[in-house]
UniProtKB/Swiss-Prot annotation:
One of its GO terms (cellular component) is cytoplasm. The gene is NPPB. Heart atrium. Keywords: Disulfide bond, Hormone, Secreted, Signal, Vasoactive. Its main location: secreted. This is Natriuretic peptides B. It is found in: Secreted. The record marks R96, G97, R99, S100, P101, K102, T103 as: Cleavage. InterPro entries: Natr_peptide, Natr_peptide_CS, Natriuretic_peptide, Natriuretic_peptide_brain. One of its GO terms (molecular function) is hormone activity. Disulfide bonds join C109-C125. Belongs to the natriuretic peptide family. The precursor molecule is proteolytically cleaved by the endoproteases FURIN or CORIN at Arg-99 to produce the active brain natriuretic peptide 32 and the inactive NT-proBNP. CORIN also cleaves the precursor molecule at additional residues including Arg-96 and possibly Lys-102. Undergoes further proteolytic cleavage by unknown proteases to give rise to Brain natriuretic peptide 26.
């Protein structure tokens, strides 16, 4: 056995030895885990307590939120003057419809959709810039 063959064999044996050292079993019930178990259990108990507190607060606040929303809606309806044009007034809706670009009148050359394209690009007849 020459020196050229001895070096690769020694390296191979060293590699196999190191590889087998890493293949040993590592059971989960070691001493390190047993010392951490009470701390983990305490954290879990605190988390459960906190979740139950938050759920109790949530169930207590839900009826209050619903009652507050109903009373605010009722007060807003009572506070709205009857003679002033509101957002649901029919006259207000008609005026809003005249101003909206969807209901622009035809330009005479194109239909409604092309008039809308023409107003953006400058194409078409009688293009009026309303914006």
């Amino acid at each position: 056995m020459g020196p050229r063959m001895a070096l690769p064999r020694v390296l191979l044996l060293l590699f196999l030895h190191l590889l087998l050292l890493g293949c040993r079993s590592h059971p989960l019930g070691g001493a390190g885990l047993a010392s951490e178990l009470p701390g983990i259990q305490e954290l879990l108990d605190r988390l459960r307590d906190r979740v139950s507190e938050l759920q109790a607060e949530r169930t207590d606040l839900e009826p209050l939120r619903q009652d507050r929303g109903l009373t605010e809606a009722w007060e807003a309806r009572e506070a709205a003057p009857t003679g002033v044009l509101g957002p649901r007034s029919s006259i207000f809706q008609v005026l809003r419809g005249i101003r909206s670009p969807k209901t622009m009148r035809d330009s005479g050359c194109f239909g409604r959709r092309l008039d809308r394209i023409g107003s953006l690009s400058g194409l078409g007849c009688n293009v009026l810039r309303r914006y």
